[in-house]
From Swiss-Prot:
Source superkingdom: Eukaryota
Stated name of the protein: Dolichyl-diphosphooligosaccharide--protein glycosyltransferase subunit 4
Role according to the record: Subunit of the oligosaccharyl transferase (OST) complex that catalyzes the initial transfer of a defined glycan (Glc(3)Man(9)GlcNAc(2) in eukaryotes) from the lipid carrier dolichol-pyrophosphate to an asparagine residue within an Asn-X-Ser/Thr consensus motif in nascent polypeptide chains, the first step in protein N-glycosylation. N-glycosylation occurs cotranslationally and the complex associates with the Sec61 complex at the channel-forming translocon complex that mediates protein translocation across the endoplasmic reticulum (ER). All subunits are required for a maximal enzyme activity.
Keyword terms of this UniProt record: Endoplasmic reticulum, Membrane, Signal-anchor, Transmembrane, Transmembrane helix
Transmembrane feature ranges: 5-25
Residues in the Lumenal compartment per record: 1-4
Keyword Membrane appears in the UniProt entry: yes
Biological source species: Drosophila grimshawi
Main location (coarse class): endoplasmic reticulum
Listed GO biological process terms: protein N-linked glycosylation; protein N-linked glycosylation via asparagine
Membrane topology annotation: Single-pass type III membrane protein
Subunit structure: Component of the oligosaccharyltransferase (OST) complex.
InterPro entries given in the database record: Oligosaccaryltransferase (IPR018943), OST4 (IPR051307), Ost4p_sf (IPR036330)
Highest classification ranks of the organism: Eukaryota, Metazoa, Ecdysozoa, Arthropoda, Hexapoda
Pfam families in alphabetical order: Ost4
C-alpha cells in the first residue's frame, strides 16, 4: 500500500510540476505574443 508520506511526496511533486508547466506556458505565450506584434 501507499503510505501517507509517499502520497504527500507524490502530490507535492505533481503540484510543483503542474505549477512549473503553467508558468512555462504563460512565459512562452507572452513572449510569442510580443514577437508577433513587433514583427508587424
Amino acid at each position: 500500500m501507499i503510505t501517507d508520506v509517499q502520497l504527500a511526496i507524490f502530490s507535492n511533486v505533481l503540484g510543483v510540476f503542474l505549477f512549473l508547466l503553467v508558468v512555462a506556458y504563460h512565459y512562452i505565450n507572452a513572449n510569442t505574443g510580443k514577437s508577433i506584434i513587433k514583427s508587424k
